[in-house]
Amino acid sequence: MKKSSKLQLVGVILGVILLILLVGPFLVPVPPLAGLQPAMELADPDSRFLEVNNLAVHYKIMGEGKPVFILLHGFGASVYSWQAIMEPLSQMGTIIAYDRPAFGLTERPLEWEGESPYSSQAQVDLLNELMNQIGIQTAILVGNSAGGSVAMQFYLQYPEKVTALILVDPAVYTEHWSGGSVKWMLRTPQMRHLGPLL
């Protein structure tokens, strides 16, 4: 086989692979999710919902007075991560725990205008607006895992609103990591189409 024939064959194979990667995901049927129930039907009697930055945010409040503790859960968790400590901690002041976007009973938009509600900056903005709407001027932020990252970013942007910062096994990077190709790949139309299956 001639060298040019081998190159043509490799080119055709690479072209077919590229075509499969670009078009293939759209050929996978994504049925509507069955058996979905509204978040309000799944909520506990002490659950509350507040419209924050165009999202219905699920949260709970226990206790009263100062200090105010705001509990930020980790990846794949929810307000229920904190249920064992909310009651005892409420003896010291007001405890607020909320479900960050994509977790628990907080709304999960599949489409949006502008910045993704799942971005780091949107998480900080949501916490700031949640505090504003509830009327909290300063708080002790308690962040676990990815919630620790949100707490730290919030402190860096709004130090005047943070009385103390408690980080529990935080997912905090000491060097800048932008996500690079992983973030780019997850934002492609192909991955957004397949997202509900994952």
What is the meaning of each model-derived region?
Residues V52-N54, K60-M62, R100-V142:
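Active-site loop/oxyanion-hole signature of alpha/beta-hydrolase fold enzymes
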Residues Y80-Q83, N128, M152-L156:
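Short, hydrophobic alpha-helix immediately C-terminal to the catalytic nucleophile
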Residues L55, K60-R108:
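Conserved HGGG/HGGXW glycine-rich cap/lid loop of the alpha/beta-hydrolase fold
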Residues M152, L156-Q157, T163-L197:
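Flexible "cap/lid" loop of the alpha/beta hydrolase fold
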Residues K2-P67, M92-G93, Y118, I136-Q137:
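Alpha/beta-hydrolase fold catalytic core
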Residues G143, G147, A151:
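Gly/Ala-rich beta-loop-alpha elbow adjacent to hydrolase catalytic centers
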Residues T94, T138, K161-A164:
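Residues at the starts of beta-strands that form the adenosine-phosphate
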